[in-house]
């Protein structure tokens, strides 16, 4: 039996009942919205707690039946058959509840900023950067999320030397946050006459999209420069100084945006700057806890090689969890749920292990 926090579970049930009663009483619209939000957050865990309590009661009844010699032998045989199934259900519910009670990442529900930069490998790395962007774009489409490119630098033979985009939707960051790191590709370039396999790489960074309430940027801490722009992806040439470069003086972070509208560029650049500063704060807080972290998943080390895409073998390997899938074509079409779910499960398992050590 797992060491479940029974008092906390009872408190959650009590709070859930209180919210139900207050919502039924017809509160003001703004109060109702807040209550509904908390209700939807508590509902899954309270449902599991109630299922768990029913299963515990069922197991207790079956054990009492087995111990009572006055009970009909046939009934006791049935109880003996049912009890292992109920105990198995209890174990599954215990694990489900533990996961639902894990500390929540406040950024999980946010949209995300996706940054992909070509690394070693020249034009082949830029092509791979383009392939990765397309993979995430398709994954986003599969989930009903919106993708908008904020800035892009095209590779000489196609793809991207660098591309920055927003992915907007509920829970985007929770699904993509373990994608940060170095992605390596092994394949034969189209220009390679000898059929030799080349290795190149691209770096992916996924940041939670920060809002103004998340991070304060003082006017005196930034310098804004305007310059001539060739537009995102080189699609057009502006004759006005519309491109914007914002430098955050305390951190040295530089962000550029080069759409047609200077006003839009400033807003987009500030959006990326806010997210990078917010991410920097999160990284600092994470590093303070990293001495206790056992799992590589979620370490946020963007210099770490996390995944290899081997095209000749049709193989994808995630090195953090030693997961190998022979589904490269499907993954490059955006079907990355199996890897995303495995990484999330591994991270949750490491959190549970840490809680067990602290108990």
Swiss-Prot record:
Subcellular localization, as worded in the UniProt entry: Cytoplasm
Keywords, alphabetical: Cytoplasm, Methylation, Protein biosynthesis
Pfam family, one: PCRF
Keyword match Cytoplasm: yes
Region span, Disordered: 282-306
UniProt keyword Cytoplasm present: yes
Maturation and modification: Methylated by PrmC. Methylation increases the termination efficiency of RF1.
PROSITE patterns the record matches: RF_PROK_I (PS00745)
Gene Ontology MF terms in the entry: translation release factor activity, codon specific
N5-methylglutamine sites (modified residues): 235
Family indicated by similarity: Belongs to the prokaryotic/mitochondrial release factor family.
Name by which UniProt lists this protein: Peptide chain release factor 1
Gene: prfA
């Amino acid at each position: 039996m797992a060491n479940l926090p029974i008092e906390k579970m009872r408190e959650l049930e009590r709070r859930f009942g209180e919210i139900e009663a207050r919502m039924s009483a017809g509160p003001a619209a703004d109060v109702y919205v807040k209550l509904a939000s908390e209700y939807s957050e508590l509902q899954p865990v309270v449902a599991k707690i109630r299922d768990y309590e029913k299963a515990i009661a069922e197991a207790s009844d079956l054990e009492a039946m087995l111990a009572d010699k006055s009970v009909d032998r046939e009934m006791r045989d049935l109880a003996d058959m049912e009890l292992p199934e109920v105990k198995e259900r209890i174990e599954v519910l215990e694990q489900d509840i533990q996961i639902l009670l894990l500390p929540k990442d406040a950024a999980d529900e946010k949209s995300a900023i996706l940054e992909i930069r070509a690394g070693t490998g020249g034009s082949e790395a830029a092509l791979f950067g383009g392939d990765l962007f397309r993979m995430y774009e398709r994954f986003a489409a599969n989930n009903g999320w919106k993708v908008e490119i904020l800035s892009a630098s095209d590779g000489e033979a196609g793809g991207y030397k660098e591309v920055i985009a927003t992915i907007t939707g509920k829970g985007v960051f929770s699904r993509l946050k373990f994608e940060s790191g170095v992605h390596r590709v092994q394949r034969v370039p189209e220009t390679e006459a000898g059929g030799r396999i080349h290795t190149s790489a691209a770096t992916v960074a996924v940041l939670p999209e920060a809002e103004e309430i998340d991070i304060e940027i003082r006017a005196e801490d930034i310098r804004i420069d305007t310059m001539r722009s060739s537009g995102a992806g080189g699609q057009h040439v502006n004759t006005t100084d519309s491109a914007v470069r914002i430098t955050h003086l305390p951190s040295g972070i530089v962000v550029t945006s080069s759409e047609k509208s200077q006003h839009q560029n400033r807003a987009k650049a500030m959006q990326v700057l806010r997210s990078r500063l917010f991410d920097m704060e999160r990284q600092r807080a994470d590093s303070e806890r990293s001495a206790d972290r056992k799992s590589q998943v979620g370490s946020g080390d963007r210099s770490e090689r996390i995944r290899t895409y081997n095209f000749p073998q049709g193989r994808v390997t995630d090195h953090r969890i030693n997961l190998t899938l022979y589904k490269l074509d499907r993954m490059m079409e955006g079907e990355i749920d199996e890897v995303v779910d495995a990484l999330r499960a591994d991270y949750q398992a490491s959190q549970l292990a840490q809680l067990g050590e602290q108990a």
